[in-house]
């Protein structure tokens, strides 16, 4: 026999389902009732099961699964805990960006979105870099093979054609078995309606001054559309 009870909390309404039809089964699980809204502070996320963005801290995903020691450790991890390689192959500890707002983007040189995104990213970086804003660009060749060049070719393209001054890093995979650890972290902390996979070039993650993922934007969201969200975090 399956029974269901409903309870409410500040995080939403949950139904507790109990299956007592089998003698040796006492499994229960929570089914959250989600209210969907948009905006940087009110975004309901669904990733690897049901999850909610906490009203107390919009950058934290409150999941229905048991909060284990491992889950707690993962929740406490930030972008600042990672070390990546730059476009020249040198290690860069991301804790150097503590106290700064970051926009992390997977870029490509031969995409239909390349020109508009690089131009707008360069404009935003020039406008806000002295206020504590950083853009971290990660080249990726997984979408239509649109970033086939070497690191030196990618660097020359971005810096010569678009005058990009923001940091560009080593080419990475953002999906699949060879996914870069930084992208595993980004996706697990901001699954959202986009799901676990990066969908295309120029998907964007906005990071607050503490290294927490605040928002995720699809490739079709232009950098200029994110400007107000950047301003809010810089002012915080």
Swiss-Prot record:
Keywords: Chloroplast, Oxidoreductase, Peroxidase, Plastid, Stress response, Transit peptide
Record EC number: 1.11.1.12
Classification via PROSITE patterns: GLUTATHIONE_PEROXID_1, GLUTATHIONE_PEROXID_2, GLUTATHIONE_PEROXID_3
A GO CC term assigned to this protein in UniProt: vacuole
Compartment annotation: Plastid, Chloroplast
Main localization of the protein described in the UniProt heading: plastid
Tissue: Expressed in leaves, stems, flowers, green siliques and seeds.
Active site per UniProt: 111
GO biological process terms, semicolon-separated: response to oxidative stress
Keyword Transmembrane: no
Gene3D superfamilies, sorted: Glutaredoxin (3.40.30.10)
Pfam families, per database record: GSHPx
Name used for this protein in its record: Phospholipid hydroperoxide glutathione peroxidase 1, chloroplastic
Organism of derivation: Arabidopsis thaliana
Gene: GPX1
